[in-house]
Swiss-Prot record:
One of its GO terms (molecular function) is ATP binding. Its main location: cytoplasm. One of its GO terms (cellular component) is cytoplasm. It comes from the Bacteria. The keyword Oxidoreductase does not apply. Transmembrane segments: none annotated. This is Phenylalanine--tRNA ligase alpha subunit. It catalyses: tRNA(Phe) + L-phenylalanine + ATP = L-phenylalanyl-tRNA(Phe) + AMP + diphosphate + H(+).
Length: 331
């Protein structure tokens, strides 16, 4: 039988030199495992005389407990050292200045919406809102958009059923206000609108601001001066603004509004379309219960994302909706 004291002494030295819990676990296996050195001594007891076995077995068990205690104690010390080192590494220097919380900022579309609202609020316009789910009448019929108009097609409009849909513009808000109130009116109607379209410059949901002014003796000159003043203040430039004849079923006459956006190679102005407008069609007044013989008015509409793209130099409309903090942190 191998010398028990020698085995215990070697175990003590090995435990003292161990630098990790993994090393200690390996020592436990080497000395106390199924094939460990001390365990093997117990298996060799059968070779001894019957009279010697009890005393030898007691010594081996005592040695086994001693080595186990040494290993457990060493594990405890290592664990304490590791915990102390971890706490030291994670300690907080309370003398350092505190870190400020990361604050969010307004989304560029929200900034643009507020900028538009601010201008018209200072011009005496109220901000009106209405439901995004509309009936066919307020979204189309009351705005002089007949049943055969292309805007009613399934590929352009989200329908719930033949008479209920997601609004394609905020004009229904104007109709509802005119139905429930008496002129004069000055209002803008900001909000989300929905159309079946998706590419670099279109999304199925986008934001729109439509405006309406109704009073006695309102003329196209009033419309023009309002739009020109708004665009020059919005872009903070003395822009050239062009009104180009167009067609909208709810206004007559109607116009597309273009702004100066650089120069062509020959030095001529490069025009960029930004919004639509016109004088309110008499049939719209009739549907809303307003006397078109007494009152006249103008209306205009603009896409908020489009204006935001132009103001902030964004080329892809979809970036506004991807919630990429690398993009949003720039505003």
């Amino acid at each position: 039988m191998e010398n028990l004291e020698g085995i215990v002494d070697r175990a003590k030295d090995a435990v003292a030199k161990a630098e990790s819990e993994q090393s200690l676990e390996q020592l436990r296996v080497d000395y106390l495992g199924k094939k460990g050195r001390i365990t093997q001594l117990l298996k060799e007891l059968g070779r001894l005389d019957a009279a010697e076995r009890p005393a030898a077995g007691a010594k081996i068990n005592e040695a086994k407990l001693l080595v186990q205690d040494l290993i457990n104690e060493a594990k405890s010390e290592l664990s304490s050292k590791n915990e102390a080192a971890k706490l030291a590494a994670e300690s907080i220097d309370v003398t350092l200045p505190g870190r400020k919380e990361s604050l969010g900022t307004l989304h560029p579309v929200t900034r643009t919406m507020l900028r538009i609202e601010d201008f018209f609020a200072r011009s005496g316009y109220t901000v009106e809102e209405g439901p995004e789910i509309q009936d066919d009448y307020h979204n189309f019929e009351a705005l002089n958009i007949p049943s055969h108009h292309p805007a009613r097609a399934m590929h352009d409009t989200f329908y719930f059923d033949p008479k209920t849909l997601l609004r394609t513009h905020t004009s229904p808000v104007q109709i509802r206000v005119m139905e429930s109130s008496k002129p004069p009116f000055r209002m803008i109607c900001p909000g989300r609108v929905y159309r079946c379209d998706s590419d670099m410059t279109h999304t199925p949901m986008f934001h729109q601001v439509e405006g309406l002014m109704v009073d006695k003796h309102v003329s196209f000159a009033d419309l023009k001066s309002t739009i020109v003043e708004f665009l020059r203040e919005f872009f903070e430039k003395d822009l050239e603004v062009r009104f180009r004849p167009s067609y909208f079923p709810f206004t007559e006459p109607s116009a597309e509004v273009d702004i100066e956006w650089g120069r062509n190679e020959d030095g001529s102005i490069k025009w960029l379309e930004v919004m639509g407008c016109g004088m309110v069609h008499p049939k719209v007044f009739e549907a809303a219960g307003v006397d078109s013989e007494t009152y006249s008015g103008f209306a205009f509409g603009m896409g908020v994302e489009r204006l935001a793209m132009l103001r902030y130099g964004v080329n892809d409309l979809r970036m506004f909706f991807e919630n990429d903090m690398r993009f949003l942190d720039q505003f």
